[in-house]
A protein has these predicted regions:
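Short, solvent-exposed turn/loop segments enriched in Gly/Ser/Thr/Pro and often Arg
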Residues: 218-227, 269-275, 709-710
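Intrinsic-disorder/low-complexity accessory segments
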Residues: 29, 33-134, 139-185, 199, ...
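Short helix-loop-beta-strand segments that form the rim/entrance of peptidase-like active sites
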Residues: 169-177, 190-232
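Acidic/His-rich structured neighborhood in mature extracellular/periplasmic domains
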Residues: 183, 239-241
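Gly-rich Lys/Arg/Thr-decorated short loops/hinges at beta-loop-alpha junctions or inter-strand turns
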Residues: 232-238
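Secretory targeting and sorting signals
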Residues: 1-30
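Proline-aspartate-enriched helix->loop->beta-strand connector
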Residues: 258, 262-272
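Caspase-like (clan CD) cysteine peptidase catalytic core
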Residues: 246-255
């Protein structure tokens, strides 16, 4: 058994901590991985989100961007400039503030015909995102030929492999992404150095590189975070966790850059790991990759980058960590496609995360002298630039092999070939712990008609797949596949397609990795098939001959099926259903809520219902002859994490962020209907006046809690008589659940998501179990081990209450031990939160 040596990194990391509300013995969570940012840490449980719209917005740009000719290269844009911002956190480090980037790029465009600059989007606060291309000039005809060759590589890789013109003339693309974490600054400055060098140098080697390549730079992926000195963007999202959710505009821009440029190799520049860290990752590796095609170049160039960094001569950058070689399983894995590098691999790139060595953010930024910070940043910039220069040199030397490599990835996918078995020693250090493969199904079907749980969710899933360059077709006639019959309009994902790895990574269940690694760097379970609310069937084998058409966008799903004059009904099975309800409430429509959660719209409001049906893709049916309870516009006071705040607003709720501090400062709760608590609110720390306001809210409204912070609030406030039992702190993944006893959560999906799972025992009188963990081992995919003393594992959660509800002190209370809005990803679980809020607000 090959065992990788462990390198100890001198880093400051947050210990895993989960508040225990049970009498079980205290057990230390597993030690944090070097450089690891715990996926469910203080930022989600202890620090309540504030309103992003209240964040400091920079002064607006001067003028507009003026794009020039777009038929060839260069493609120049006279960039609008932003007023000087003396508060930009880059300045203290001696680095380039955001407002100085546009003038610098404008000046380079005036000097050189090798540089192109395009604005590919805006941040949440309205700052421009710059894509810079360095390449030898091209006529419009030459650019059309490059585009045709790039398309041929993906669409017909067999022909591409034989195309002699492509072999001679295709410009191999490389994409370098910088500053996705706003307080990891130096990649941007290294990129600007390389941009200027490649645009202006007379070095024949550089000119030869640009004659055979296109070099793309995302100059700063997170301008708002760069200016503010925050890891997250202005909405509070870690964007290096958002690639298969795409909630953020910056992430959508990066996704499109990857798809449009189709790089054969890419870098994602980060910080800070002592000595420098250069991927490939350690195991577990994503099981949907053609790993042989990645690792043979990935490891070789990784070692070349290591040598280049060490060659700079800085003592602080000599102990370079290559996780594939140096770290044991789970310490720096490449399992989920949520990271930039791991996502880009599914588009045919040999990809790397780079971590530069010297910390200048967080406490270091505040405590170190300016001279020391600038010394560190200068070294970091040199290290980052060394990885860029080395990779560009590798691209030049191995252009043919890297292009062939990408062609072969797409060819195998289109042919539906099995992954290759890699023997031990395939590259130095490759062993059994690196061997992760899967069996691809023949197809997935997203049914239309009665076999579909939610047409709204199905359409959203289809649109997401298409946005990620996964090929989806829609049946034009009824068909039978895998022993099931489907109506016309059903969607088909044929797994014989170039990017079958990404398609399967999004649609498969995943894997229980609990026995493959002692911990994981971040999440280990996700599945759009199981967590996004749509019914999706697996076709394991057989011929796929279905009359169908290519899908560019999902077909409309909204409508009103009730006869004129009838009241209308809407079941809230999806977050989009909640959006429609909240839209109607915002218009002043008087709605009723039935005992099973169905929302009734008066017949007189049919026109409004038709409008929201079209807007959100929901479908109204005839309402039953039941009275129900009035449902009015709900105002939610939310002490929640940033991702939960985003998800609540995505559903259209009127949300007022609160915390212990804001309530103690006198925040008025008199117009609030429901209090949601998951982060940053302690009942026992409220001053008497604030506590009186909260108690008054109990008497008239509802309470929804999530996680350890929510459970502590429930206990301290004396609400539901339950004991919350914490699972292991870093346990996460998809779990099977039993909804058979549900009242509030009736109609929920049979799977849920957990991170730091909880369950509830010692249920007192009046407490109802809304959802239970399935018997046996409920974990479907992810990583969930018990603590060292045997507590907190999945078998302890077996059959236990995962979600409970009841009434106490006049309040309707619902408590989640699951994570229905984690990073705004599990869209199919959002309706559970909406149902809890509506139930809590009605009487």
């Amino acid at each position: 058994m090959h065992v990788k040596r462990r390198v100890l990194l001198a880093l400051t990391t947050a210990a895993l901590a989960v508040t225990s509300l049970t009498a079980a013995p205290a057990v230390a969570d597993p030690a944090a991985v070097p450089g690891r940012d715990f996926g469910n840490g203080p930022e989600r449980n202890e620090v309540a989100a504030t309103d992003p719209v209240a964040a400091k917005r920079s002064a607006g740009p001067l003028g507009e961007n003026k794009a020039g000719v777009r038929q060839g290269y260069p493609r120049k844009t006279q960039l609008r400039v932003y007023p000087e911002d003396t508060t930009d956190k880059s300045i203290k480090l001696g680095l380039t503030p955001y407002h100085a980037i546009a003038p610098r790029l404008n000046a380079l465009q005036a000097r050189s015909d090798r540089i192109s600059v395009e604005v590919v989007g805006q941040t949440g606060l309205g700052r421009d995102l710059y894509l810079v291309t360095l390449t030898a000039p091209e006529t419009a005809r030459e650019t059309r030929q490059q585009d045709a060759w790039r398309a041929l590589i993906e669409n017909d890789p067999v022909r591409a492999a034989r195309d002699k013109g492509l072999e001679r003339g295709y410009k191999a693309p490389v994409w370098i992404n910088n500053n996705i974490h706003g307080n990891e600054w130096e990649g941007t400055d290294a990129a600007l150095r390389q941009i200027e060098y490649l645009a202006t140098t007379n070095d024949p080697a550089a000119k030869r590189l640009l004659a055979t390549s296109r070099v793309y730079f995302n100059v700063t992926a997170n301008p708002d975070g760069r200016v503010a000195g925050t890891r997250a963007n202005s909405a509070g999202f870690d964007m290096n966790r958002d690639f298969v959710t795409n909630t953020q505009p910056e992430n959508r821009a990066m996704r499109d850059m990857i798809i449009d440029t189709q790089p054969v190799i890419m870098l994602d520049e980060h910080g800070y790991v002592a000595g420098t860290l250069i991927e490939p990752t350690g195991p577990p590796h994503g099981q949907n990759y053609d790993f042989d095609l990645y690792i043979k170049h990935g490891y070789t160039n990784g070692l070349e980058m290591e040598k280049a960094v060490q060659g700079l001569g800085y003592p602080e950058a000599q102990e370079v960590v290559v996780p594939f070689r140096d770290l044991p399983p789970g310490e720096w894995d490449g399992w989920p496609p949520i990271f930039t590098a791991q996502y880009a691999m599914y588009h045919g790139a040999v990809s790397y995360t780079i971590e530069i060595p010297l910390r200048v953010n967080n406490a270091a930024y505040d405590q170190l002298p300016v001279e020391e910070l600038r010394r560190r940043s200068a070294i970091n910039t040199d290290v980052s630039e060394a990885t860029m220069k080395t990779t560009l040199a590798y691209l030049y030397r191995h252009r043919d092999e890297l292009v062939d490599n990408q062609i072969e990835i797409f060819r195998r996918g289109a042919a539906g070939e099995a992954q290759r078995y890699l023997p031990d020693g395939f590259v130095p250090g490759f062993g059994p712990e690196d061997r992760f493969t899967t069996e691809f199904p023949r197809a997935y079907v997203i049914p239309a008609g009665s076999g579909q749980r939610s047409a709204t969710a199905a359409a959203r899933l289809v649109d997401l797949l298409v946005d990620h360059d996964v090929r989806v077709r829609q049946a034009t006639r009824p068909f039978t596949l895998g022993g099931r019959s489907y109506p016309a309009g059903s969607y088909l994902v044929d797994m014989h397609q170039p990017k079958r790895g990404l398609a399967n990574a999004m649609l498969e269940a995943g894997k229980d990795l609990s026995n493959d690694a002692p911990q994981m760097y971040d999440i280990a379970g996700w599945s759009h098939r199981l967590l996004w609310g749509a019914s999706v069937d697996i076709v394991k084998q057989g011929q796929v001959r279905v009359p169908s058409r290519d899908v560019v966008a999902a077909s409309p799903t909204g409508g009103v099926d009730a006869a004129p004059g009838r009241d209308l009904a809407l079941r809230v099975l999806d977050g989009k259903d909640a959006s429609a309800v909240n839209d109607l409430l915002g218009r002043g429509v008087e709605l009723r809520r039935l005992a099973d959660g169905t929302v009734v719209v008066p017949a007189a409001e049919r026109a409004a219902a038709a409008e929201v049906a079209d807007r959100y893709g929901v479908r109204f049916t005839s309402a039953p002859n039941e009275q129900g309870s009035p449902l009015r516009r709900v105002t939610v006071a939310a002490a929640v994490s940033a991702d939960e705040l985003f998800a609540l607003r995505e559903m259209g709720f009127d949300v007022r962020p609160v915390s212990t501090a804001t309530l103690n400062a006198g925040y008025d709760l008199s117009r609030v209907d429901v209090l949601m608590v998951s982060s940053g609110l302690r009942y026992d720390q409220l001053v008497p006046a604030a506590k009186a306001q909260v108690d008054a809210l109990f008497a008239r409204g509802g309470v929804v809690t999530r996680g350890a912070t929510g459970s502590r609030f429930n206990a301290d406030a004396g609400l539901l008589p339950v004991t919350a039992v914490p699972g292991r702190g870093d346990a996460n993944g998809i779990v099977d659940v039993d909804n058979s006893g549900a009242s509030v959560l009736a109609g929920s999906t049979p799977q849920s998501f957990v991170y730091s799972p909880q369950w509830f025992v010692n249920l007192g009188a009046g407490v109802r179990v809304e959802q239970r963990y399935a018997p046996g081992n409920p974990l479907v995919a992810g990583h969930w081990l018990p603590n060292d003393d045997g507590s907190g594992g999945p078998t302890q959660a077996s059959g236990q209450a995962a979600v409970v509800s009841g009434e106490a002190k006049g309040a309707r209370v619902l408590m989640f031990g699951t994570e229905p809005m984690f990073r705004a990803h599990p869209k199919g679980l959002f309706a559970q939160v909406a149902a809890a809020i509506y139930w809590g607000a009605t009487r």
